[in-house]
Amino acid sequence: MKNILKKQIYWRIPLAFSLLTSSCSDYLDKLPENTVEVEGIDYTNKSNMYMPVSGVYATARGYLGSWSSYGCIIVRGDDVNKGGSPTDQIEYEYASKFQYDRLTTFWALSGLWGNCYYVVSTSNSALESLENYAKHLTSESDKQLNAQYAAEVRFFRAYAYFQLVNLFGDVPLLLDNQELNVFKNTKEDVKKYIYDELDYCIANLPAIRPNESEHPGAVTKYTAEMLKAKQKMYDNEWDEVLALTEDIVNSGKFELYNDFYELFKIPGKLCNESLLEYQFTDFGNGSGDIVSSDNWFAFQGPRGEAPISGWAFIEPTEKIRNLFSKRGESVRAETTFLMTDATTRDGDYIPVAQPGEPTAYNGKAYTPANQMTPGRTGYGDNNNIRVFRYADVLLMNAEAKVRKGQNGDAPLNLVRERAGLAPIANATLDQILEERQVELALEWGERFFDLVRTDRATQELPGFVKGESEYYPIPQDQIDLNPNLEAEPVPFEPEVTE
Protein backbone atom coordinates (compact mmCIF):
# COMPACT_ATOMS: atom_id res chain seq x y z
CA MET A 1 0.00 0.00 0.00
CA LYS A 2 1.93 2.98 -1.28
CA ASN A 3 -0.23 5.67 0.20
CA ILE A 4 -2.48 5.30 3.20
CA LEU A 5 -5.70 7.24 3.21
CA LYS A 6 -5.24 10.03 5.69
CA LYS A 7 -8.22 9.97 7.97
CA GLN A 8 -8.54 13.64 8.80
CA ILE A 9 -10.06 13.47 12.25
CA TYR A 10 -10.53 16.73 14.08
CA TRP A 11 -11.40 16.66 17.75
CA ARG A 12 -12.42 19.67 19.73
CA ILE A 13 -11.90 20.18 23.41
CA PRO A 14 -14.53 20.44 24.65
CA LEU A 15 -15.80 17.33 22.94
CA ALA A 16 -19.39 17.40 21.78
CA PHE A 17 -19.96 13.80 20.76
CA SER A 18 -23.21 12.27 19.68
CA LEU A 19 -23.57 9.39 22.11
CA LEU A 20 -25.69 6.68 20.60
CA THR A 21 -26.95 3.36 21.86
CA SER A 22 -24.57 0.47 22.42
CA SER A 23 -26.14 -2.90 21.76
CA CYS A 24 -23.31 -4.81 23.47
CA SER A 25 -24.41 -7.14 26.22
CA ASP A 26 -20.86 -8.45 26.36
CA TYR A 27 -18.06 -6.46 24.84
CA LEU A 28 -17.10 -9.22 22.43
CA ASP A 29 -20.45 -10.90 21.85
CA LYS A 30 -21.63 -8.34 19.32
CA LEU A 31 -20.10 -5.78 17.03
CA PRO A 32 -19.09 -2.65 18.97
CA GLU A 33 -20.88 0.64 18.53
CA ASN A 34 -18.06 2.53 20.27
CA THR A 35 -20.73 4.61 21.94
CA VAL A 36 -22.52 4.93 25.23
CA GLU A 37 -26.15 5.86 25.67
CA VAL A 38 -26.92 8.33 28.44
CA GLU A 39 -30.54 9.29 27.82
CA GLY A 40 -33.57 7.13 27.09
CA ILE A 41 -32.50 4.21 29.28
CA ASP A 42 -34.52 2.44 31.92
CA TYR A 43 -32.09 2.80 34.81
CA THR A 44 -34.23 0.60 37.01
CA ASN A 45 -33.30 -2.41 34.86
CA LYS A 46 -30.04 -3.40 36.48
CA SER A 47 -29.54 -6.30 34.05
CA ASN A 48 -28.38 -3.68 31.52
CA MET A 49 -25.93 -2.00 33.90
CA TYR A 50 -22.88 -3.40 32.09
CA MET A 51 -23.90 -1.90 28.75
CA PRO A 52 -22.13 1.46 29.22
CA VAL A 53 -19.04 -0.38 30.44
CA SER A 54 -18.93 -2.57 27.33
CA GLY A 55 -19.14 0.60 25.26
CA VAL A 56 -15.99 1.89 26.94
CA TYR A 57 -14.12 -1.35 26.22
CA ALA A 58 -15.16 -1.08 22.58
CA THR A 59 -14.02 2.54 22.43
CA ALA A 60 -10.72 1.79 24.16
CA ARG A 61 -9.78 -1.05 21.84
CA GLY A 62 -10.75 0.96 18.78
CA TYR A 63 -9.16 4.27 19.73
CA LEU A 64 -6.34 3.54 22.19
CA GLY A 65 -5.48 0.63 19.89
CA SER A 66 -5.46 2.78 16.76
CA TRP A 67 -2.69 1.90 14.31
CA SER A 68 -1.90 5.52 13.47
CA SER A 69 -1.65 6.44 17.14
CA TYR A 70 0.53 3.40 17.80
CA GLY A 71 2.94 4.67 15.17
CA CYS A 72 3.31 7.97 17.04
CA ILE A 73 3.79 6.14 20.35
CA ILE A 74 6.39 3.62 19.22
CA VAL A 75 8.50 5.38 16.61
CA ARG A 76 10.70 7.52 18.88
CA GLY A 77 12.74 4.68 20.41
CA ASP A 78 16.05 3.39 19.06
CA ASP A 79 14.48 -0.01 18.46
CA VAL A 80 12.17 1.20 15.67
CA ASN A 81 12.46 2.71 12.21
CA LYS A 82 9.40 4.12 10.50
CA GLY A 83 9.37 1.50 7.77
CA GLY A 84 7.04 1.66 4.80
CA SER A 85 8.21 3.20 1.55
CA PRO A 86 10.66 6.08 2.08
CA THR A 87 8.16 8.90 1.52
CA ASP A 88 4.96 7.29 2.82
CA GLN A 89 3.79 8.89 6.07
CA ILE A 90 7.11 10.74 6.27
CA GLU A 91 5.95 12.49 9.43
CA TYR A 92 6.69 9.34 11.40
CA GLU A 93 10.30 9.77 10.26
CA TYR A 94 10.27 13.37 11.49
CA ALA A 95 8.95 12.15 14.84
CA SER A 96 11.76 9.60 15.13
CA LYS A 97 14.27 12.41 14.57
CA PHE A 98 12.48 14.75 17.01
CA GLN A 99 11.74 17.31 14.30
CA TYR A 100 8.56 18.33 16.04
CA ASP A 101 8.19 21.60 14.14
CA ARG A 102 7.26 19.45 11.12
CA LEU A 103 4.50 17.61 13.01
CA THR A 104 2.11 20.37 14.04
CA THR A 105 -0.31 19.49 11.23
CA PHE A 106 0.35 15.72 11.19
CA TRP A 107 -3.03 14.04 10.97
CA ALA A 108 -1.97 10.98 13.02
CA LEU A 109 -0.72 13.12 15.91
CA SER A 110 -4.01 14.99 15.95
CA GLY A 111 -5.75 11.63 15.84
CA LEU A 112 -3.72 10.40 18.81
CA TRP A 113 -4.80 13.43 20.85
CA GLY A 114 -8.41 13.02 19.78
CA ASN A 115 -8.46 9.27 20.32
CA CYS A 116 -7.39 9.66 23.93
CA TYR A 117 -9.97 12.35 24.61
CA TYR A 118 -12.66 10.28 22.92
CA VAL A 119 -11.97 7.56 25.47
CA VAL A 120 -12.16 10.19 28.23
CA SER A 121 -15.45 11.51 26.89
CA THR A 122 -16.97 8.06 26.47
CA SER A 123 -15.85 7.18 29.99
CA ASN A 124 -17.42 10.34 31.40
CA SER A 125 -20.73 9.43 29.76
CA ALA A 126 -20.54 5.83 30.97
CA LEU A 127 -19.93 6.99 34.53
CA GLU A 128 -22.96 9.26 34.29
CA SER A 129 -25.03 6.25 33.25
CA LEU A 130 -23.65 4.15 36.10
CA GLU A 131 -24.50 6.90 38.58
CA ASN A 132 -28.07 6.84 37.28
CA TYR A 133 -28.22 3.07 37.75
CA ALA A 134 -26.81 3.44 41.26
CA LYS A 135 -29.74 5.64 42.31
CA HIS A 136 -32.06 2.65 41.92
CA LEU A 137 -29.92 -0.01 43.63
CA THR A 138 -30.81 -1.21 47.10
CA SER A 139 -28.74 -4.31 47.85
CA GLU A 140 -25.11 -4.01 48.92
CA SER A 141 -24.06 -6.60 46.35
CA ASP A 142 -25.59 -4.56 43.53
CA LYS A 143 -23.96 -1.39 44.82
CA GLN A 144 -20.61 -3.16 44.99
CA LEU A 145 -21.03 -4.39 41.42
CA ASN A 146 -21.86 -0.85 40.31
CA ALA A 147 -18.66 0.38 41.97
CA GLN A 148 -16.69 -2.36 40.20
CA TYR A 149 -18.13 -1.35 36.83
CA ALA A 150 -17.30 2.29 37.56
CA ALA A 151 -13.74 1.22 38.38
CA GLU A 152 -13.42 -0.56 35.03
CA VAL A 153 -14.45 2.65 33.28
CA ARG A 154 -12.21 4.83 35.42
CA PHE A 155 -9.25 2.59 34.59
CA PHE A 156 -9.57 3.41 30.90
CA ARG A 157 -10.03 7.09 31.63
CA ALA A 158 -6.84 6.95 33.70
CA TYR A 159 -5.04 5.07 30.94
CA ALA A 160 -6.07 7.68 28.38
CA TYR A 161 -4.62 10.38 30.61
CA PHE A 162 -1.51 8.24 31.16
CA GLN A 163 -0.97 8.32 27.41
CA LEU A 164 -1.72 12.03 27.15
CA VAL A 165 0.54 13.20 29.97
CA ASN A 166 3.48 11.07 28.86
CA LEU A 167 3.12 11.98 25.20
CA PHE A 168 2.11 15.65 25.40
CA GLY A 169 3.01 16.82 28.92
CA ASP A 170 0.62 19.45 30.26
CA VAL A 171 -2.90 18.56 29.06
CA PRO A 172 -6.47 19.45 30.06
CA LEU A 173 -8.34 17.30 32.55
CA LEU A 174 -11.79 17.00 31.04
CA LEU A 175 -14.25 16.11 33.76
CA ASP A 176 -17.40 17.27 32.01
CA ASN A 177 -18.14 16.68 28.34
CA GLN A 178 -19.86 20.07 28.21
CA GLU A 179 -16.85 22.10 29.35
CA LEU A 180 -15.89 24.87 26.95
CA ASN A 181 -12.49 26.28 26.04
CA VAL A 182 -10.63 24.39 28.73
CA PHE A 183 -7.07 25.22 29.77
CA LYS A 184 -4.23 22.79 30.19
CA ASN A 185 -3.46 21.42 33.63
CA THR A 186 0.05 20.77 34.88
CA LYS A 187 1.70 17.40 34.42
CA GLU A 188 1.86 17.05 38.19
CA ASP A 189 -1.88 17.58 38.56
CA VAL A 190 -2.66 15.16 35.74
CA LYS A 191 -0.48 12.48 37.33
CA LYS A 192 -2.09 13.02 40.72
CA TYR A 193 -5.47 12.63 39.04
CA ILE A 194 -4.31 9.38 37.45
CA TYR A 195 -3.14 8.07 40.81
CA ASP A 196 -6.42 9.00 42.49
CA GLU A 197 -8.38 7.25 39.75
CA LEU A 198 -6.24 4.14 40.01
CA ASP A 199 -6.54 4.06 43.79
CA TYR A 200 -10.30 3.86 43.31
CA CYS A 201 -9.80 1.09 40.76
CA ILE A 202 -7.50 -0.88 43.05
CA ALA A 203 -10.01 -0.64 45.88
CA ASN A 204 -13.02 -1.69 43.80
CA LEU A 205 -11.78 -4.14 41.16
CA PRO A 206 -11.58 -7.89 41.87
CA ALA A 207 -8.22 -9.42 42.78
CA ILE A 208 -8.19 -11.88 39.89
CA ARG A 209 -6.53 -12.33 36.51
CA PRO A 210 -8.31 -10.77 33.54
CA ASN A 211 -8.94 -14.25 32.11
CA GLU A 212 -10.76 -15.21 35.33
CA SER A 213 -13.31 -12.42 34.99
CA GLU A 214 -17.01 -12.97 34.30
CA HIS A 215 -16.28 -10.87 31.21
CA PRO A 216 -13.00 -12.49 30.09
CA GLY A 217 -10.24 -9.95 29.63
CA ALA A 218 -11.81 -7.28 31.82
CA VAL A 219 -9.39 -5.15 33.81
CA THR A 220 -8.80 -6.15 37.43
CA LYS A 221 -7.11 -4.83 40.54
CA TYR A 222 -3.77 -6.05 39.21
CA THR A 223 -4.19 -4.26 35.87
CA ALA A 224 -4.70 -1.02 37.78
CA GLU A 225 -1.71 -1.74 40.01
CA MET A 226 0.47 -2.31 36.97
CA LEU A 227 -0.56 0.97 35.35
CA LYS A 228 0.09 2.84 38.59
CA ALA A 229 3.48 1.12 38.90
CA LYS A 230 4.42 2.18 35.37
CA GLN A 231 3.64 5.83 36.05
CA LYS A 232 5.48 5.66 39.38
CA MET A 233 8.44 4.13 37.52
CA TYR A 234 8.42 7.02 35.06
CA ASP A 235 8.44 9.35 38.07
CA ASN A 236 11.25 7.38 39.79
CA GLU A 237 9.16 6.66 42.88
CA TRP A 238 10.65 3.27 43.63
CA ASP A 239 9.08 2.54 47.01
CA GLU A 240 5.67 2.51 45.36
CA VAL A 241 6.87 0.63 42.29
CA LEU A 242 8.19 -2.08 44.57
CA ALA A 243 5.04 -2.26 46.70
CA LEU A 244 2.71 -2.39 43.69
CA THR A 245 4.69 -4.98 41.75
CA GLU A 246 5.22 -7.09 44.87
CA ASP A 247 1.47 -7.26 45.34
CA ILE A 248 1.05 -8.54 41.79
CA VAL A 249 3.89 -11.05 42.09
CA ASN A 250 2.87 -12.28 45.53
CA SER A 251 -0.73 -12.78 44.42
CA GLY A 252 0.40 -15.98 42.73
CA LYS A 253 -2.09 -15.29 39.97
CA PHE A 254 0.30 -14.68 37.10
CA GLU A 255 2.99 -16.63 35.30
CA LEU A 256 5.04 -16.27 32.16
CA TYR A 257 3.60 -18.04 29.14
CA ASN A 258 5.98 -20.90 28.41
CA ASP A 259 6.34 -20.24 24.67
CA PHE A 260 7.53 -16.74 23.74
CA TYR A 261 6.85 -17.40 20.06
CA GLU A 262 3.21 -18.28 20.62
CA LEU A 263 2.70 -15.60 23.30
CA PHE A 264 1.83 -12.96 20.71
CA LYS A 265 -0.19 -15.29 18.49
CA ILE A 266 -3.61 -16.94 18.75
CA PRO A 267 -2.60 -19.56 21.40
CA GLY A 268 -1.35 -16.79 23.69
CA LYS A 269 -4.57 -14.76 23.76
CA LEU A 270 -5.62 -13.95 27.34
CA CYS A 271 -3.04 -16.30 28.82
CA ASN A 272 -1.94 -16.15 32.45
CA GLU A 273 0.75 -13.59 31.53
CA SER A 274 -1.81 -11.08 30.31
CA LEU A 275 -2.86 -8.08 32.39
CA LEU A 276 -4.40 -6.11 29.52
CA GLU A 277 -5.25 -6.89 25.92
CA TYR A 278 -7.42 -5.19 23.34
CA GLN A 279 -9.66 -8.03 22.22
CA PHE A 280 -10.85 -8.89 18.74
CA THR A 281 -12.70 -11.85 17.27
CA ASP A 282 -14.11 -13.27 14.08
CA PHE A 283 -16.47 -15.46 16.14
CA GLY A 284 -14.88 -18.55 14.57
CA ASN A 285 -16.57 -17.83 11.24
CA GLY A 286 -14.81 -17.46 7.91
CA SER A 287 -17.05 -14.59 6.85
CA GLY A 288 -19.58 -12.20 8.27
CA ASP A 289 -19.38 -10.27 11.52
CA ILE A 290 -15.94 -9.49 12.88
CA VAL A 291 -14.57 -7.30 15.66
CA SER A 292 -11.49 -6.05 13.84
CA SER A 293 -8.33 -4.28 14.97
CA ASP A 294 -8.84 -1.76 12.14
CA ASN A 295 -5.42 -2.38 10.60
CA TRP A 296 -3.21 -2.33 13.72
CA PHE A 297 -1.68 -5.59 12.49
CA ALA A 298 -1.77 -4.65 8.80
CA PHE A 299 0.09 -1.41 9.57
CA GLN A 300 3.05 -3.54 10.71
CA GLY A 301 2.60 -6.42 8.29
CA PRO A 302 5.02 -7.39 5.51
CA ARG A 303 4.54 -6.83 1.83
CA GLY A 304 3.13 -10.05 0.49
CA GLU A 305 0.10 -12.07 -0.43
CA ALA A 306 -2.97 -12.22 1.82
CA PRO A 307 -3.34 -13.15 4.57
CA ILE A 308 0.34 -12.42 5.31
CA SER A 309 0.19 -8.95 3.88
CA GLY A 310 0.41 -5.45 5.25
CA TRP A 311 1.75 -1.94 4.84
CA ALA A 312 5.36 -2.59 5.91
CA PHE A 313 5.63 -0.02 8.69
CA ILE A 314 7.56 -0.36 11.99
CA GLU A 315 10.95 -1.86 11.18
CA PRO A 316 13.29 -3.15 13.90
CA THR A 317 16.46 -1.06 13.77
CA GLU A 318 19.87 -2.48 12.99
CA LYS A 319 20.88 -1.37 16.48
CA ILE A 320 18.34 -3.58 18.26
CA ARG A 321 19.02 -6.49 15.92
CA ASN A 322 22.73 -6.23 16.64
CA LEU A 323 22.06 -6.21 20.38
CA PHE A 324 20.03 -9.41 20.08
CA SER A 325 22.86 -11.00 18.10
CA LYS A 326 25.52 -9.87 20.58
CA ARG A 327 23.54 -11.36 23.47
CA GLY A 328 23.01 -14.68 21.72
CA GLU A 329 19.25 -14.22 21.64
CA SER A 330 17.45 -16.86 19.62
CA VAL A 331 14.05 -17.41 21.27
CA ARG A 332 13.18 -13.73 21.44
CA ALA A 333 14.84 -12.90 18.13
CA GLU A 334 12.67 -15.36 16.21
CA THR A 335 9.55 -13.78 17.67
CA THR A 336 10.55 -10.12 17.64
CA PHE A 337 12.02 -9.94 14.13
CA LEU A 338 9.99 -11.13 11.14
CA MET A 339 12.77 -11.33 8.57
CA THR A 340 12.33 -10.90 4.83
CA ASP A 341 13.39 -13.55 2.31
CA ALA A 342 12.74 -16.16 4.97
CA THR A 343 10.12 -18.73 5.88
CA THR A 344 8.69 -18.80 9.38
CA ARG A 345 8.38 -22.00 11.39
CA ASP A 346 4.68 -21.95 10.45
CA GLY A 347 5.52 -22.02 6.75
CA ASP A 348 4.77 -18.41 5.78
CA TYR A 349 7.27 -16.99 3.30
CA ILE A 350 8.12 -13.32 3.89
CA PRO A 351 9.11 -11.79 0.53
CA VAL A 352 12.23 -9.79 -0.18
CA ALA A 353 11.70 -6.12 0.54
CA GLN A 354 11.33 -3.54 -2.18
CA PRO A 355 14.25 -1.10 -2.49
CA GLY A 356 14.27 1.29 0.45
CA GLU A 357 11.76 -0.75 2.44
CA PRO A 358 12.26 -2.84 5.60
CA THR A 359 14.29 -6.03 5.66
CA ALA A 360 12.51 -7.04 8.88
CA TYR A 361 9.13 -6.36 10.46
CA ASN A 362 7.64 -6.42 13.93
CA GLY A 363 7.25 -10.13 14.59
CA LYS A 364 5.11 -9.43 17.64
CA ALA A 365 2.38 -8.38 15.21
CA TYR A 366 2.67 -11.57 13.12
CA THR A 367 -0.21 -14.05 13.05
CA PRO A 368 0.55 -17.21 11.04
CA ALA A 369 -1.84 -18.11 8.24
CA ASN A 370 -2.35 -21.58 9.71
CA GLN A 371 -3.74 -20.06 12.92
CA MET A 372 -6.33 -17.93 11.16
CA THR A 373 -9.95 -18.93 10.71
CA PRO A 374 -10.33 -20.42 7.21
CA GLY A 375 -11.88 -17.80 4.96
CA ARG A 376 -10.41 -14.80 6.77
CA THR A 377 -7.77 -12.89 4.86
CA GLY A 378 -7.03 -9.82 6.99
CA TYR A 379 -3.55 -9.83 8.53
CA GLY A 380 -3.95 -10.47 12.25
CA ASP A 381 -7.69 -11.23 12.11
CA ASN A 382 -8.88 -12.84 15.36
CA ASN A 383 -5.71 -11.93 17.26
CA ASN A 384 -5.50 -9.54 20.22
CA ILE A 385 -3.26 -6.55 20.80
CA ARG A 386 -1.07 -7.18 23.84
CA VAL A 387 -0.77 -4.12 26.07
CA PHE A 388 0.34 -5.13 29.60
CA ARG A 389 2.35 -8.29 30.30
CA TYR A 390 3.52 -9.94 33.51
CA ALA A 391 7.09 -9.96 32.16
CA ASP A 392 7.05 -6.17 32.46
CA VAL A 393 5.85 -6.47 36.07
CA LEU A 394 8.76 -8.80 36.87
CA LEU A 395 11.29 -6.43 35.30
CA MET A 396 9.83 -3.42 37.12
CA ASN A 397 10.02 -5.42 40.33
CA ALA A 398 13.64 -6.37 39.68
CA GLU A 399 14.61 -2.78 38.92
CA ALA A 400 12.85 -1.44 42.00
CA LYS A 401 14.68 -3.94 44.19
CA VAL A 402 18.09 -3.09 42.77
CA ARG A 403 17.47 0.64 43.04
CA LYS A 404 16.60 0.12 46.69
CA GLY A 405 19.76 -1.87 47.37
CA GLN A 406 18.06 -5.25 47.28
CA ASN A 407 18.67 -8.28 45.08
CA GLY A 408 16.54 -8.41 41.93
CA ASP A 409 17.83 -11.69 40.52
CA ALA A 410 14.73 -13.81 41.09
CA PRO A 411 12.23 -11.84 38.96
CA LEU A 412 14.86 -11.02 36.35
CA ASN A 413 15.90 -14.62 35.90
CA LEU A 414 12.33 -15.79 35.40
CA VAL A 415 12.25 -13.62 32.28
CA ARG A 416 15.68 -14.80 31.16
CA GLU A 417 14.81 -18.46 31.71
CA ARG A 418 11.83 -18.19 29.38
CA ALA A 419 14.17 -16.68 26.78
CA GLY A 420 16.57 -19.63 27.09
CA LEU A 421 19.32 -17.58 28.75
CA ALA A 422 21.52 -18.42 31.72
CA PRO A 423 20.67 -16.83 35.07
CA ILE A 424 22.51 -13.75 36.31
CA ALA A 425 23.85 -13.41 39.85
CA ASN A 426 23.79 -10.03 41.59
CA ALA A 427 22.24 -8.30 38.58
CA THR A 428 23.08 -4.64 38.06
CA LEU A 429 20.79 -1.83 37.00
CA ASP A 430 22.35 -1.79 33.53
CA GLN A 431 21.68 -5.50 33.11
CA ILE A 432 18.04 -5.08 34.08
CA LEU A 433 17.58 -2.12 31.74
CA GLU A 434 19.11 -4.10 28.88
CA GLU A 435 16.76 -6.97 29.68
CA ARG A 436 13.85 -4.54 29.36
CA GLN A 437 15.24 -3.31 26.06
CA VAL A 438 15.22 -6.85 24.66
CA GLU A 439 12.09 -8.30 26.29
CA LEU A 440 9.90 -5.28 25.50
CA ALA A 441 11.37 -4.37 22.11
CA LEU A 442 8.83 -2.93 19.65
CA GLU A 443 6.12 -2.68 22.30
CA TRP A 444 4.29 0.58 23.08
CA GLY A 445 7.31 2.88 23.09
CA GLU A 446 8.75 1.23 26.20
CA ARG A 447 12.32 1.82 25.06
CA PHE A 448 11.82 5.57 24.53
CA PHE A 449 10.22 6.07 27.92
CA ASP A 450 12.96 4.02 29.60
CA LEU A 451 15.63 6.21 28.01
CA VAL A 452 13.87 9.39 29.09
CA ARG A 453 13.31 8.33 32.71
CA THR A 454 16.92 7.11 33.08
CA ASP A 455 18.31 10.30 31.51
CA ARG A 456 19.96 8.35 28.70
CA ALA A 457 17.92 9.66 25.78
CA THR A 458 20.45 12.30 24.73
CA GLN A 459 23.16 9.64 24.64
CA GLU A 460 21.17 7.04 22.69
CA LEU A 461 18.76 9.00 20.48
CA PRO A 462 20.22 11.22 17.73
CA GLY A 463 18.42 14.54 17.64
CA PHE A 464 16.96 14.27 21.14
CA VAL A 465 17.28 17.50 23.14
CA LYS A 466 16.69 17.24 26.86
CA GLY A 467 13.93 19.56 27.98
CA GLU A 468 12.50 19.81 24.45
CA SER A 469 12.06 16.36 22.93
CA GLU A 470 10.23 14.53 25.71
CA TYR A 471 6.77 15.66 24.59
CA TYR A 472 5.00 16.06 21.29
CA PRO A 473 3.54 19.48 20.46
CA ILE A 474 -0.20 19.91 20.80
CA PRO A 475 -1.62 19.59 17.26
CA GLN A 476 -2.26 22.92 15.58
CA ASP A 477 -5.85 22.07 14.66
CA GLN A 478 -6.62 21.63 18.36
CA ILE A 479 -5.08 25.01 19.16
CA ASP A 480 -7.11 26.60 16.36
CA LEU A 481 -10.28 25.21 17.92
CA ASN A 482 -9.30 26.18 21.45
CA PRO A 483 -6.65 28.92 21.71
CA ASN A 484 -6.54 28.42 25.49
CA LEU A 485 -4.34 25.41 24.81
CA GLU A 486 -1.49 27.85 24.12
CA ALA A 487 -1.83 29.45 27.54
CA GLU A 488 0.20 28.41 30.57
CA PRO A 489 -1.30 25.46 32.48
CA VAL A 490 -3.58 26.22 35.39
CA PRO A 491 -3.94 24.42 38.72
CA PHE A 492 -6.49 21.63 38.78
CA GLU A 493 -9.49 22.33 40.98
CA PRO A 494 -11.56 19.16 41.35
CA GLU A 495 -15.23 19.49 42.08
CA VAL A 496 -16.13 19.07 45.71
CA THR A 497 -19.18 16.86 46.22
CA GLU A 498 -21.16 17.05 49.40
Regions found by a protein language model. Give the residues of each.
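Long, intrinsically disordered, low-complexity segments
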Residues: S23-S25, P86, C116-V119, Y193, ...
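Membrane-proximal, proline-rich intrinsically disordered regions
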Residues: C24-V75, T245, P475, E486-E498
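Short, surface-exposed recognition loops and adjoining beta-strand edges that mediate ligand/DNA contacts
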Residues: E39-Y43, S47, W67-D88, L174, ...
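Conserved, well-structured interaction surfaces
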Residues: K46-S54, A58-L64, P86-F168, L180-E188, ...
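Flexible, polar/acidic helix-loop-strand segments at domain edges
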Residues: Y94-Y100, N322-R389
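Extended ligand-binding clefts on enzyme/binding-domain cores
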Residues: N250-P358
